[in-house]
């Protein structure tokens, strides 16, 4: 009798373990194999009129672990899993193979059935009657073990990624806490200087010129804003809410990465007869960053530099080990530069300078650059080139030694 047509092998479904002959038919959803599968199933249905056997049909798309378990390389495939030895029939002539093997399979199954009848009369040491093992059920268990093993492997990889992200955040928090000292010290010095020279009796500052008082107040205010921003960054890192971009940080040689990008853009700047000057120290430490994301930043900044630098102009690239925890990378051009009033807004999404409204401007892609650098808990900014043009700078965390 044909059993369990088009069902998945599962420990939860009924298993006809009393059937001495047990077969698995592996199929897939390809239209080309549909007719062949139908012919195989029809032939098996004819055989069941003469002999009782167990058949389960398995869709490899739904249960790939079973296909992996049996190391199948093609479907459809018919497998005799019981009685031993196991046999696999595959290819375009499965029915022909089955016709040749069927008498032997039937004889082996009959022999096994006779042995099982003899076992029914035996008892084990505990007085229990020995029972035949369900081979199909054991296959289901094997498939489940394969699936669980795969899941464990994936979970281990996820765990490693999460640990790396936690370690990255720990280093970033340590870096930001360390960097808080500079603006705190500068603000404290300015406030202490003002406090020590203020005479409350007359309501005036002594020994301080008005211009210096204004400058000290401005410095204290500027440093307070810097501290406020850094605290916001710390809170964001602690909450883990920076989900705008997914980065996979690793040890990255940013100098080498920049030279690779320059090689890709060589035709662009040589066509305009532009000169490229690099000042990247050989001992510049590696950064802890996502190389593909940083490549995007470098391509965007260098593309803009080439675009806005006139023919025969100069593009400058420099690397600087700014602190023990930061590397600064800078790209300069000799183009028209960025007006001071626009240097903050230039990183806004789709923002263009008035002069660039008729064409693609700096704002295209710079917002992405800012998002990428911020995702690395770095900073990006622009200032003027003394020789004309603009310098774009960004910082990245140093890879821990």
Curated annotation (Swiss-Prot):
Alphabetized GO MF terms: ATP binding; phosphorelay sensor kinase activity
Matches recorded under PROSITE patterns: HIS_KIN (PS50109)
Keyword Nucleus found: no
Its job: Member of the two-component regulatory system SasA/RpaA involved in genome-wide circadian gene expression. One of several clock output pathways. Participates in the Kai clock protein complex, the main circadian regulator in cyanobacteria, via its interaction with KaiC. KaiC enhances the autophosphorylation activity of SasA, which then transfers its phosphate group to RpaA to activate it. In addition to its output function, recruits fold-shifted KaiB (KaiB(fs)) to KaiC to cooperatively form the KaiB(6):KaiC(6) complex (independent of SasA kinase activity).
Reaction equation(s) it catalyzes: ATP + protein L-histidine = ADP + protein N-phospho-L-histidine
E.C. number: 2.7.13.3
Domain notes: The N-terminus interacts with KaiC, while the C-terminal histidine kinase domain autophosphorylates and is probably responsible for self-oligomerization. The N-terminal domain stimulates the C-terminus to autophosphorylate.
Any one GO biological process: circadian rhythm
InterPro entries in the cross-refs: HATPase_C_sf, His_kinase_dom, HisK_dim/P_dom, HisK_dim/P_sf, KaiB_domain, Kinase_SasA, Sensor_HK_Regulatory, Sig_transdc_His_kin-like_C
Positions of post-translational Phosphohistidine modification: 178
Keyword match Ubl conjugation: no
UniProt source species: Nostoc sp. (strain PCC 7120 / SAG 25.82 / UTEX 2576)
Highest taxon above the source species: Bacteria
Histidine kinase domain segment(s): 175-400
PANTHER family xrefs: SENSOR HISTIDINE KINASE RCSC, TWO-COMPONENT HISTIDINE KINASE
Subunit (UniProt): Homooligomerizes. Interacts with KaiC. Participates in the KaiABC clock complex, whose core is composed of a KaiC homohexamer, 6 KaiB and up to 6 KaiA dimers. SasA and KaiB(fs) compete to bind to KaiC.
UniProt KW keywords: ATP-binding, Biological rhythms, Kinase, Nucleotide-binding, Phosphoprotein, Transferase, Two-component regulatory system
Protein name as annotated: Adaptive-response sensory kinase SasA
């Amino acid at each position: 009798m044909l059993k369990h047509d088009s069902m998945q092998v599962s420990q939860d479904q009924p298993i006809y373990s009393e059937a001495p002959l047990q077969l698995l038919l592996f199929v897939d959803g390809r239209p080309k194999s549909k007719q062949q599968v139908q012919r195989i199933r029809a032939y098996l249905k004819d055989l069941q009129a003469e002999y009782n056997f167990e058949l389960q049909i398995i869709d490899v798309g739904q249960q790939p672990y079973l296909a992996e378990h049996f190391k199948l390389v093609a479907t459809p495939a018919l497998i005799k899993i019981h009685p031993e030895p196991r046999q696999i029939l595959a290819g375009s002539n499965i029915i022909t193979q089955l016709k040749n093997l069927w008498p032997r399979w039937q004889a082996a199954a009959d022999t096994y059935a006779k042995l099982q009848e003899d076992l029914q009369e035996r008892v084990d040491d505990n007085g229990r009657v020995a029972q035949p093992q369900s081979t199909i059920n054991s296959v289901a268990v094997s498939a489940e073990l394969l699936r669980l093993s795969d899941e464990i492997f994936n979970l281990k990889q996820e765990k490693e990624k999460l640990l790396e992200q936690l370690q990255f955040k720990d280093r970033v928090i340590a870096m930001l806490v360390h960097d808080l000292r500079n603006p705190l010290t500068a603000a404290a010095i300015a406030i202490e200087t003002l406090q020590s020279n203020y005479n409350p009796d007359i309501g005036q500052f002594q020994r301080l010129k008005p211009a210096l008082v204004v400058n000290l107040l401005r410095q204290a205010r500027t440093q307070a804003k810097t501290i406020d921003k850094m605290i916001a960054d710390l809170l964001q890192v602690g909450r883990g809410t920076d989900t705008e971009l997914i980065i996979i940080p690793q040890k990255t040689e940013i100098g080498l990465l920049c030279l690779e990008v320059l090689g890709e853009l060589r035709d662009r700047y040589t066509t305009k007869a532009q000169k490229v000057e690099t000042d990247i120290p050989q001992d510049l430490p590696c950064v802890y960053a996502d190389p593909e994301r940083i490549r995007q930043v470098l391509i965007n900044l260098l593309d803009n530099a080439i675009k806005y630098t006139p023919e025969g102009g100069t593009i400058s690239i420099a690397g600087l080990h700014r602190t023990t925890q930061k590397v600064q990378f800078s790209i300069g051009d000799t183009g028209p530069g960025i007006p001071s009033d626009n240097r903050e807004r230039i990183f806004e999404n789709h923002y263009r300078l008035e002069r660039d409204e008729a064409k693609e401007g700096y704002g295209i892609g710079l917002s992405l650059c800012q998002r990428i650098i911020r995702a690395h808990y770095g900073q990006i900014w622009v200032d003027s080139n003394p020789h004309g043009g603009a310098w774009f700078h960004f910082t990245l965390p140093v890879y821990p030694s």
